Amino acid sequence: MTDGAPEIDRLDEPPTRRRRQLWAALTVFLLLLTCGLPAALLVGAVRDAGSRTVLDRLGTPAPDPATLAARQLAERITAQLDRQATALLAGNRAGFLAVAEPAAHPDLRRRFAALRALRVTVWQASPNGVPETVPGRPGEWRLLVEFRYCFVTPDCRPSPVLIGTRWKESGEQPRLVAMEESRSAATGTRPWETSELVVAVGARTLVATTPALRGQLPRLMSQAEAAARVADSYAVDGAPPDRYRVFHAGRAEWQRWYGGGRPKWTGGYAVTVGGGHHEVVLNAEGLSPAGLDDLLRHELTHAASLPERGYPGTSTWWLVEGLAEFAGVDGQPVDRYEGLDEVRRLAAGGWTGRLDDLSPADDAPADRVAGSYGISYLAVRHLVDRFGQERLLDFFRAVVHERRAVAEAAEEVFGEPWPALHDACVAYVRGLSG
């Protein structure tokens, strides 16, 4: 399962120098404040003076004290974030905690331990905007911070996450009062923000779970490594992920990680987190060892095949899920597919006969969901049997990555009109389910 076509926080471009970004934002803010003044009173330019950006205003006074104080505080917070990042990457927990008030230490200890267990190799912190006073808390400021991270591989493209931080002025250096949970509408809260984690790292995967499920970790790692070898062959752009990131959730974590709230029929999902990465989450409840193999192949194939921005929409759901199901069955004969009974029931009634009308509702019953996945698998299977896996992946790239019309992509890749191919796929499904 995927999260459809999520719009992630648009924070995935290579970071600029932190201070330059911050000063540019402050400059725009100041210009907006003065836009109502007559043009004759404002003649200015922005010049880069070493490590500072200065806004010159001929005939106007220096910035007001509040603006100047916010700028200076932002510089000091940035320095503290830099110290904390250096300590994290060095494995220096005392240094990681040193920038914070004691009340924040328990949460920061958990974050530090989880990130170190995940083998964090890149940790960059850049202020997003300027500090704002916290109402009712004199001397306390809130600042959004964009954190970028890599696990295991030091040269990966970092994944971004935007987190609110609160700071208290205390002498020369501000002190971190609290680090909030990220609450992106698209991705929700990452596991390392909220949970203790135990982690195993293999040649192709990083697998994390909770201490309560520690005993399952060796088997999970073995199965994930086997699934990764299958998923690698579905990397549409030819470059599989540096590591597949898999998070195995207990009941409480399933409701909390990445925002929770998944449909009841969901056994796992892949969510895009930026930096070219999709993180896979598995629901520990109700998974059998055999079912876990199929599910891992399915979800890791999403991570290998999907573009960073997600897929175009529900009309292409059948292609996205059909490819993942095709990888999940891993070459087994079609008559051994476990969902054939559900396919027969859905094909006999309740389905319009259109592939672009297969995406199940969140509250759909389990047999309707299984039938939708099964029909999608059979349609993709038919296309692979006729044209081969390589051309199917070319078709997938054109439709899902390049977002071209299905009819246009079919003509170019398969050399046949899409209406005829669509009808052939449907006939194949009905022939097997009749």
Question: Which functions belong to the PLM regions below?
Answer:
Residues 112-158, 286, 297:
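Surface-exposed, charged secondary-structure patches
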Residues 1-52, 116-120, 364-370, 401-434:
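Beta/coil-rich, acidic/histidine-enriched accessory regions frequently appended to metallopeptidases
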Residues 69-72, 90-136:
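Short solvent-exposed beta->alpha transition segments
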Residues 67-72, 83-85, 206-221, 281-291, ...:
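Second-shell loop/turn segments in exported
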Residues 2-23, 44, 48-53, 142, ...:
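Short beta-strand edge/turn micro-motifs at domain boundaries
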